[in-house]
Curated annotation (Swiss-Prot):
Gene3D superfamilies: 3.30.160.20, 3.30.70.1660, 6.10.140.1950. GO terms for molecular function: translation release factor activity, codon specific. It comes from the Bacteria. Residues 282-301 are annotated as: Disordered. The keyword Cytoplasm applies. The modification N5-methylglutamine is found at residue 232. This is Peptide chain release factor 1. SMART domains: PCRF. Belongs to the prokaryotic/mitochondrial release factor family. It comes from Heliobacterium modesticaldum (strain ATCC 51547 / Ice1). It holds the Pfam family PCRF. Methylated by PrmC. Methylation increases the termination efficiency of RF1. Transmembrane segments: none annotated.
Length: 354
């Protein structure tokens, strides 16, 4: 591990020199490329340097233990205990930082939420999830943009697609893909019985145009009048757009903007993200079957998380974590939940490396 870290530190120092080279400074494209590469190494280099400082401190404390002065020995013993604990903490952090990085981690995300089992109640729950992720994004200082929405009569969503733009958005939200289940008394239920409904969530990294080149000849583009809740036509111009990617059969519709051009741009962003995800799945056969089961049919039996309103709890079934603060979670306070999923994923990766 130390050898790897020393190579990284050496590369970091080389980049520092390059960034002050007048020739590089004049070439902004090269300078930005080097600056981005160095920024990606800063945390691991800072942690490694702190680790080396702790190792030096341990050597110094052990030398003090050999002194004849009892007070110095006691001071050194206390310091040594603290330094050894810090050493273990930094070693663990360095192991995590050395794990292979998901190339999509720093990307923006497109979140697709679809109502599953449960009719209108499932559509209302899809709306709850949309607001939960939007509020989480607000807490992070990220930007959200509604790309597409298919409303129901009472304010829910049959489907809603949102773009979240922010540094590391995909790394934080990628484990949200799957079936989310809700248990509560529906607003439409007069007898007070608890119902179970489901909604599916798919989290896709946003694809840049350079990553996914779409041949215009492989697209069928249909335009139609956009409709609002209940299916009524909200304008008489054909501003809504449906794009079909003929080779894959992927279909994307967008009707939220009054401008056909803007709807087309939004639909293309979603299409590129879905094509990138398809390419990733084909490269990783396991991921393909994993996403199919995660997105699935929205059936209540294939769940990753349950939101239980009567008990005020949220349970993530993959890691066995239950939190009794459903209200704050639905208000976007997701850090504890997401961090636990990231930590579990890192621990599993570390096991495979041992």
């Amino acid at each position: 591990m130390i050898d790897k870290l020393e190579i990284i530190e050496q590369k970091y120092d080389e980049l520092t020199q390059l960034l002050s080279d007048p020739e590089i400074i004049q070439d902004q494209t090269r300078w930005q490329r080097h600056a981005k590469q160095q920024a990606g190494m800063t945390e691991i280099v800072d942690t490694f340097r702190a680790y080396k400082g702790v190792l030096q401190g341990i050597d110094d404390a052990r030398a003090m233990l050999a002194e004849s002065d009892p007070e110095l020995q006691e001071m050194a013993s206390l310091e040594l205990d603290e330094l050894l604990a810090r050493k273990e903490e930094l070693e663990q952090r360095l192991k995590v930082l050395l794990l292979p990085k998901d190339p999509n981690d720093d990307k923006n995300v497109i979140i697709e939420i679809r109502a599953g089992t449960g009719g209108e109640e499932a559509a209302l729950f899809a709306g709850d999830l949309y607001r939960m992720y939007s509020r989480f994004a607000d807490r992070q200082g990220w930007r959200t943009e509604l790309l597409s929405a298919n409303y129901t009569d009472i304010g829910g969503f049959k489907e809603v697609i949102v773009l979240i733009e922010g540094q590391g958005a995909f790394s934080k939200l990628k484990f949200e893909s799957g079936v989310h289940r809700v248990q509560r008394v529906p607003a439409t239920e007069s007898s007070g019985r608890i119902h179970t409904s489901a909604a599916t969530v798919a989290v896709l990294p946003e694809a840049e145009e350079v990553e996914i080149e779409v041949n215009p000849n492989e697209l069928r583009i249909d335009v139609f009048c956009s409709s609002g809740a209940g299916g009524q036509h909200v304008n008489k111009t054909e501003s809504a757009v449906r794009i079909t990617h003929l080779p894959t059969g992927i279909v994307v519709s967008c009707q939220d903007e009054k401008s056909q051009l803007k709807n087309r741009e939004k639909a293309m962003r979603v299409l590129r993200a879905r094509l990138l995800e398809k390419a990733r799945e084909e490269q990783h056969g396991e991921m393909a079957s994993a996403r199919k089961s995660m997105v699935g049919s929205g059936d209540r039996s294939e769940r990753i998380r349950t939101y239980n309103f009567p008990q005020g709890r949220v349970t993530d079934h993959r890691i066995g974590l239950t939190l009794h603060r459903l209200e704050t979670i639905l208000d976007g306070d997701l850090d504890e939940l997401l961090d636990a999923l990231i930590t579990t994923d890192q621990a599993e990766k570390l096991k495979t490396m041992e």
